[in-house]
Amino acid sequence: MVQRSQIMEQGAQKRPLPTGNGKVVYFQRYSPLALISQSPTEGSNPDAVDLSATNVSCTVAEYASYTKISKLLSLTAIDPKMKGAVEVMGINAGESRDALVRLELDNGTEQLAGSKTLISNIASSDTFSANEVRKAVKTLKIQKAMKYDDGYFLGKTNPYGSYALMGDSTWVNAHTYKDGDNLYKGELGRLHGVRFVEGSEATKTSSTVDVYNSYIHGKEAFAVTDLEGDRQHVYVKNPGANSTDNPVDRFSTVGWAMSFAVKVLDPNWIIVCKHA
């Protein structure tokens, strides 16, 4: 249940951080090698080439929230085991984590709909169209972004973006896939070499019209790290004999917590499509 709302981190490079190893995780982003155009001298080894790598670091941070449930409410509510509160907190945890990932994805490469050069020039007709998808895929290919193992890039949109995409005549709905058992969470369909999932929230910029962000990215474009021992979890705490902050057992608590980090590894491999 706590995982229900997590759409945006799909496709991330995931690396857990063991306890006792500090708060910083390092990833390496390798630069493409020059192409070989000449054969070596017969019978000899080629010259060794140097790998060029950039270290990308991210720091794990704590995130948490909780609510108090009065003893009177817990004794008189129709839902005595607080299932409703647990569900609400679980959804909030998932949506909060999703938002943190989405905000980090905003650090990718911008593509303004309708070939506009300023966000203020985006009009209501500049939607997240099939043509925008084609342009994003072209950019990713030029940047040598890696596709996922299924041969597709991954797209992440919102209700504003999906409305335009699903009206295109070349759109393929997810339920028509031959391999329909291997869907992403929230998958809608695919278009021009991109499989799309939909989240309920969107990064919005208020301008001449409201402008929303959708994303298309390749494999290894961003990373997510969880601290072992403090992964995302919902906690239910009942009054206890040793609880000094609750001396007369007047409340219980329901909350969630996690230690987590997300980081864009290569902004050239994430296209942030800004559209109406």
Language-model region placement:
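Sequence/fold signature of self-assembling virion shell proteins
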Residues: 1-5, 121-139, 166-276
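Beta-strand elements of well-folded, non-transmembrane domains
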Residues: 31, 71, 258-262
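Acidic glycine-/aspartate-rich tracts in secreted/extracellular proteins
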Residues: 33, 160-163
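Short acidic, glycine/tyrosine-flanked loop/strand segments centered on an H-E-D-like triad
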Residues: 50-77
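Alpha-helical scaffold segments that mediate packing/assembly in large oligomeric complexes
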Residues: 73-145, 160, 275
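Short gly/pro-enriched beta-turn/loop segments at secondary-structure junctions
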Residues: 146-152, 189-191
